[in-house]
Amino acid sequence: MTDKIRTVQGKVVSDKMDKSFVVAIERTVKHPLYGKFIRRTTKLHVHDENNEAKLGDVVEIQECRPVSKTKSHKLVRVVEKAVA
């Protein structure tokens, strides 16, 4: 059985923790009755072994085994650095 490793992109909204940060992932959902597209945000805690990601960066993350109670994703790469 081959499992596809799920990767997503998001924006770093907090990097105050050691070896971890919080990513906000935005998606659009169509309202069931009115049909208007609404933005929904999901926040995930991500493991960052080398503290590479900084506030405002766009990063690519993937699912992994649970690292702690809230962290079950890890950093793959920094896609775009934040403008300083």
From Swiss-Prot:
Keywords: Ribonucleoprotein, Ribosomal protein, RNA-binding, rRNA-binding. The keyword RNA-binding applies. One of its GO terms (biological process) is translation. PROSITE patterns: RIBOSOMAL_S17. GO terms for cellular component: cytosolic small ribosomal subunit. CDD domains: Ribosomal_uS17 (cd00364). Coiled coil: none annotated. It comes from the Bacteria. GO terms for molecular function: rRNA binding; structural constituent of ribosome. Disulfide bonds: none annotated. One of the primary rRNA binding proteins, it binds specifically to the 5'-end of 16S ribosomal RNA. Belongs to the universal ribosomal protein uS17 family. Part of the 30S ribosomal subunit. This is Small ribosomal subunit protein uS17. It comes from Haemophilus ducreyi (strain 35000HP / ATCC 700724).
